[in-house]
């Protein structure tokens, strides 16, 4: 957005994760977080009559004063923390809340600044609780307060570090369980006696610039929401082109200027009725930020996007922040990242800048969604065969052959045995057709320019047999919505990405990559000197290389799924 641009930023692209600005340092471990623990200071010691109150709450895993009284998932960590401190109070000393406790309460009350709901951390309740502590509270009251703050702190710290929802609930192969923080140890060493507890907790957040940029735009869009009066732009049945009248010109100008697609210094005619000039340029800018070709025309899709309430954009930002927290905080090598809703792949430099980005085609939204996971690129195959999958062979190839026995020859396929022996690359007999149907014989497409994989594929072994590859239909990249594949990811101009992937292999520059793709040697496998992480992620809100926020359609419905999961689960 123009009024938000200060300087270019680097980005990977995750959301509702999108991966931008990833830290590439390796070897992060939890002990590093605790390398310099703060010296311990004792909290208030309980009397013999107060101890049972503490043990009762801790042992039961329940504090009735919490919005979510049951804290069973945190019970072990809570017990460990109090045992470490001799069953003394942690946040209260001499009947008063210690500075560290007040600092943590401030974070809980302002959890919305991180895209979280303060209600989940008793945010609105802390003011009254603090007031009650000024009124000669009983020891039981102090115990209830102290344990409530301990539980709420843990409930806040965990999602800040690795997200509220486990991505495996959606069958995404992203490991947040391996990122789980030893909460008792962290609070003991880094929070209870820290000079700046908020700074210690902030270290747990994703270290990526893209995450921070998106987080910074959250209050901006919340400001837009406060200005929104609910009025909509007039819908259209026919596309409005530059120079034509449009009933919503004044409203359109106000909106585009408010959100920064028209620069603040541009003067607009408050009585205009013709769609032209700065409005057209503003619409182009808006279209580009919302996954549309920037035509400048007001068609039904563009009007629908313009009428999307700010609250929806805020939700997209929050869902993407959640997905950011699912990702590893560091990588052994600069990664390759595919953001599905954006239809884009990025490769990163060691310093975190974007080495290159390319448009991609992803799996069909209905029936062939591309998976979400983290894997490692192991090798590249030049001029590959396309080994037709069993489902495509049975459900698509067989019907084609039944209609036309010469289908195999026309499309450069061949039928082979499990050992790779060619049975036919011409007309298919009934016996061979039965072998194809029963999967006793396999169908593959010969290498070459007409191969569906194009002239190269990038392999990262995975159960879904998904990989990055070229295409024999580059014209499809001109489409705004590009979910055309059976799950694999087609890359525009793949030679550039392949050269980047092979950059550490001696002798493999762009010219050699191009020559090999157009050479005569088929199915040539080149193993990588060092494996490269690859992430396939899903973020419907991102900040791009030009430092502009962009929003994309929820092509797979994963934003809706995550929204439901967050609504039904408490922290």
List the predicted regions and their residue ranges:
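A cross-kingdom signal targeting lumenal/periplasmic-facing segments of multi-pass membrane
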Residues: 97-174
């Amino acid at each position: 957005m123009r009024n938000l641009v200060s300087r270019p930023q680097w980005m990977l692209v995750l959301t509702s994760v999108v991966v931008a600005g990833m830290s590439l340092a390796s070897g992060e471990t939890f002990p590093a977080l605790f390398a310099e623990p703060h010296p311990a200071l004792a909290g208030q010691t309980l009397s013999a009559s107060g101890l049972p109150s503490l043990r009762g709450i801790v042992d039961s895993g329940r504090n009735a004063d919490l919005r979510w009284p049951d804290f069973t998932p945190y019970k072990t960590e809570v017990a460990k923390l109090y045992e470490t401190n001799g069953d003394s109070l942690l946040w209260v000393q001499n009947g008063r809340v210690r500075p560290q406790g007040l600092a943590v309460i401030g974070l809980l009350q302002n959890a919305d600044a991180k895209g979280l709901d303060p209600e989940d951390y008793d945010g609105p309740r802390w003011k009254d609780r603090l007031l009650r502590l000024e009124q000669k509270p009983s020891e039981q009251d102090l115990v209830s307060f102290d344990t409530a703050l301990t539980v709420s702190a843990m409930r806040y710290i965990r999602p800040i570090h690795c997200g509220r929802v486990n991505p495996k609930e959606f069958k995404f192969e992203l490991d947040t369980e391996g990122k789980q923080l030893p909460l008792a140890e962290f609070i003991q060493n880094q929070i209870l006696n820290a000079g700046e507890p908020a700074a210690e907790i902030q270290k747990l957040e994703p270290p990526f610039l893209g995450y921070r940029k998106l987080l910074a735009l959250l209050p901006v869009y919340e400001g837009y929401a406060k200005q929104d009066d609910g009025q909509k732009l007039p819908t259209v049945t026919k596309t409005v082109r530059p120079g034509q009248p449009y009933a919503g010109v004044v409203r359109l100008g106000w909106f585009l200027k408010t959100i920064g697609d028209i620069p603040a210094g541009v003067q607009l005619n408050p009585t205009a009725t013709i769609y032209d000039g700065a409005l057209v340029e503003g619409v182009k800018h808006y279209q580009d930020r919302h996954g549309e070709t920037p035509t400048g025309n007001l068609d039904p899709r563009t009007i629908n996007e313009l009428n999307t309430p700010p609250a929806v954009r805020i939700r997209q930002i929050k869902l993407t922040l959640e997905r950011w927290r699912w990702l590893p905080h560091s990588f052994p090598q600069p990664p390759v990242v595919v953001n599905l809703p954006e239809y884009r792949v990025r490769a990163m430099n060691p310093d975190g800048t974007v080495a290159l980005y390319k448009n991609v085609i992803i799996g069909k939204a209905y029936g062939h969604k591309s998976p979400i996971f983290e894997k490692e690129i192991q090798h590249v195959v030049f001029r590959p065969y396309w080994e037709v999958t069993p489902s495509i062979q049975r459900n698509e190839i067989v019907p084609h052959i039944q209609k036309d026995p010469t289908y195999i020859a026309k499309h450069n396929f061949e039928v082979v045995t499990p050992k790779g022996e060619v049975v036919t690359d011409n007309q298919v007999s009934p016996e061979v057709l039965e072998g194809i149907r029963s999967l006793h014989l396999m169908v593959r497409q010969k290498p070459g320019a007409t191969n569906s994989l194009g002239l190269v594929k990038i392999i990262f072994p995975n159960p879904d047999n998904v990989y990055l590859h070229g295409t024999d239909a580059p014209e499809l990249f001109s489409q705004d919505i590009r979910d055309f594949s059976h799950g694999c990811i087609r890359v525009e101009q793949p030679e550039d990405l392949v050269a980047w992937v092979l950059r550490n292999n001696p002798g493999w520059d762009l010219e050699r990559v191009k020559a090999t793709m157009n050479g005569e040697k088929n199915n040539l496998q080149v193993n990588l000197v060092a494996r490269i992480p690859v992430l396939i992620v899903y973020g419907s809100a991102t900040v791009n290389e030009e430092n502009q926020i962009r929003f994309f359609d929820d092509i797979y419905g994963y934003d809706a799924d995550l929204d439901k999961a967050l609504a039904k689960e408490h922290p």
